[in-house]
UniProtKB/Swiss-Prot annotation:
Bound cofactor: record note: Branch migration by the RuvA-RuvB complex requires Mg(2+).
The encoding gene: ruvA
Origin species: Escherichia coli (strain K12)
Protein name as catalogued: Holliday junction branch migration complex subunit RuvA
Family, similarity comment: Belongs to the RuvA family.
Chain positions covered by the region annotation Domain I: 1-64
Localization in the cell: Cytoplasm
Length: 203
């Protein structure tokens, strides 16, 4: 239904971003690896989206390019993997990092992601490897994977709280999220920086 949005960023509350298109505000869930690349509030952004309809909600998931969206759609076809878990997977790893982990059968790397146990990791490897064979070889080499070090927004007083809330939204338990953030917290860090560093440290 809604495959692409081009509009002005109104608010960024990781992992959610509010984009205004033609006077309508769309709330979009984005993996943190994509969220890092968004421009600041007030600037224009283009987001490729996947629309999910549930009994209790209609949700938009957003990505910086079609390759990331394709990988997300393949992930949610896997038994036991829903949109929330797929979002967490692509927040902990970039698209290319995930593809590499699957191709190398790195179960140990996958089980470090929230919500991924050994059985789910093994199932992902088996099912996703088969799917990759039917896709173009360069499908999952998006440019976004090369720009994870882009500048984050200025630090705010509640950056740590925002970072903890984002990690909880991605599937980490509150106590675990707090511990992850406290390990890498520093006064001058923005919430996006804290989230990025906490996820990297977890892997």
């Amino acid at each position: 239904m809604i495959g692409r949005l081009r509009g002005i960023i109104i608010e960024k509350q990781p992992p959610l971003v509010l984009i205004e298109v033609g006077g309508v505000g769309y709330e979009v869930h984005m993996p943190m690896t994509c969220f890092y690349e968004l421009p600041e509030a007030g600037q224009e952004a283009i987001v490729f989206t996947h629309f999910v309809v549930r009994e209790d909600a209609q949700l938009l998931y957003g990505f910086n390019n079609k390759q990331e969206r394709t990988l997300f759609k393949e992930l949610i076809k896997t038994n036991g993997v829903g949109p929330k878990l797929a979002l967490a997977i692509l927040s902990g790893m970039s698209a290319q990092q995930f593809v590499n982990a699957v191709e190398r059968e790195e179960v140990g790397a996958l089980v470090k992601l929230p919500g991924i146990g050994k059985k789910t990791a093994e199932r992902l490897i088996v099912e996703m490897k088969d799917r990759f064979k039917g896709l173009h070889g360069d499908l999952f080499t998006p440019a976004a994977d090369l720009v994870l070090t882009s500048p984050a927004s200025p630090a705010t007083d509640d950056a740590e709280q925002e970072a903890v809330a984002a990690l909880v939204a991605l599937g980490y338990k509150p106590q675990e999220a707090s511990r992850m953030v406290s390990k890498i917290a520093r006064p001058d860090a923005s919430s996006e920086t804290l989230i990025r560093e906490a996820l990297r440290a977890a892997l």
